[in-house]
Amino acid sequence: MSQPITRENFDEWMIPVYAPAPFIPVRGEGSRLWDQQGKEYIDFAGGIAVNALGHAHPELREALNEQASKFWHTGNGYTNEPVLRLAKKLIDATFADRVFFCNSGAEANEAALKLARKFAHDRYGCHKSGIVAFKNAFHGRTLFTVSAGGQPAYSQDFAPLPPDIRHAAYNDINSASALIDDSTCAVIVEPIQGEGGVVPASNAFLHGLRELCDRHNALLIFDEVQTGVGRTGELYAYMHYGVTPDLLTTAKALGGGFPVGALLATEECASVMTVGTHGTTYGGNPLASAVAGKVLDLINTPEMLNGVKQRHDWFVERLNTVNHRCGLFSEIRGLGLLIGCVLNADYAGQAKQISQEAAKAGVMVLIAGGNVVRFAPALNVSEEEVTTGLDRFAAACEHFVSRGSS
């Protein structure tokens, strides 16, 4: 008989790069989770915007089990039917002509940045290598992507960092214009900065970046790892803005909880990549591809995407009610089901404490820095789950405020 597992085992056995909650979830269904003691939680964290269809969705389980009974992996020396079907679905649904599959958002962004450098080198010469990114962005944890992220706290311990990466102020087209020139190979931007505080880009900002990239022959990369696959009420957030990127990265919700990432590219951009220029052992794995294909089937429908917009209204209405009672937030912002509640000055820096109180009350939420409580629930979360979860969140907020004033 195996020994019981406890939260303390994490501190004993794991490299301490995370500080997980004091409870261990063991079972989930829809937007509910239960821990080892049987306590129920309403899940508004969604695995950090990953569990787009909740936990243990029956059609995703069926897709996974069906493929698992056939074969699991062959490597990139062979292709497979699920990955080709998935590629065609993404191409048909977006601007893209070609797809590269990998295992995570960081890998997708790494591939995009490498492709952009190679595209510029092949077309214009090695002098055209500059990458412009944005302060407070997050693009992953590889050395290249963490350098592009523009958050020194994540990169400062790993110098020397890759060169020729500069950071402009987000939503400031004049700041970006001062950095983008003929030596720039790419601009990478999140349509909504997720980890940076749930900050949506302005329409003028993204249109301005498209114009600057066209003027200077630079590729425009949209990092849609967090905003993609229905999260904002469109399949991808670029569709809200009417700005088409040259490259788009996607992951998180694409697998509905199964690890998968992808780089979407135009034919012109993809043409510079040849056999051996990039790759990954697990990319396009048939298990991941079978699940992701079913995720797209379920999410890319008018009913689901319109439902995300409706659920946004449920959340914002109820969060405003919570705020009227507690007075915690200066702003509630975001698109679709990526929502950030910005703490006012009296509670600055205490988002983590609020998330901990929420967990005690039986609801899981995220943070986006010290000042923003973030919600990224399942796209199919029910109205009952929203009501129950936000009632628990309200109780947590009231307890937090009363504790602070006592």
Swiss-Prot record:
Keyword Acetylation carried by entry: no
Q: Which domain of life is it from?
A: Bacteria
Identify the InterPro entries for this entry. Answer: Ac/SucOrn_transaminase_bac, AcOrn/SuccOrn_fam, Aminotrans_3, Aminotrans_3_PPA_site, Class-III_PLP-dep_AT, PyrdxlP-dep_Trfase, PyrdxlP-dep_Trfase_major, PyrdxlP-dep_Trfase_small
User: What SUPFAM superfamilies does this protein map onto?
Assistant: PLP-dependent transferases (SSF53383)
Q: Which UniProt keywords apply?
A: Aminotransferase, Arginine metabolism, Pyridoxal phosphate, Transferase
Cofactor(s) it depends on: pyridoxal 5'-phosphate
This enzyme catalyses: N(2)-succinyl-L-ornithine + 2-oxoglutarate = N-succinyl-L-glutamate 5-semialdehyde + L-glutamate
Q: Name one GO molecular function term.
A: identical protein binding
Q: What is its EC number?
A: 2.6.1.81
Tell me the residues on which N6-(pyridoxal phosphate)lysine occurs.
Answer: 252
PROSITE patterns reported in the protein's UniProt record: AA_TRANSFER_CLASS_3
Q: Does the keyword Transferase apply?
A: yes
Associated pathway: Amino-acid degradation; L-arginine degradation via AST pathway; L-glutamate and succinate from L-arginine: step 3/5
Q: Which GO terms describe its biological process?
A: alpha-amino acid biosynthetic process; arginine catabolic process to glutamate; arginine catabolic process to succinate; ornithine catabolic process
Q: Which Pfam family is one of those matched by this entry? A: Aminotran_3
What the entry lists under NCBIfam families is as follows:
arg_catab_astC, argD, PRK01278.1, PRK05093.1, PRK12381.1
UniProt family annotation: Belongs to the class-III pyridoxal-phosphate-dependent aminotransferase family. AstC subfamily.
* Purpose: Catalyzes the transamination of N(2)-succinylornithine and alpha-ketoglutarate into N(2)-succinylglutamate semialdehyde and glutamate. Can also act as an acetylornithine aminotransferase.
**Protein name in UniProt:** Succinylornithine transaminase
Q: Which organism is it from?
A: Escherichia coli O7:K1 (strain IAI39 / ExPEC)
Q: What is the lineage of its organism?
A: Bacteria, Pseudomonadati, Pseudomonadota, Gammaproteobacteria, Enterobacterales
> What is the name of the gene encoding this protein?
astC
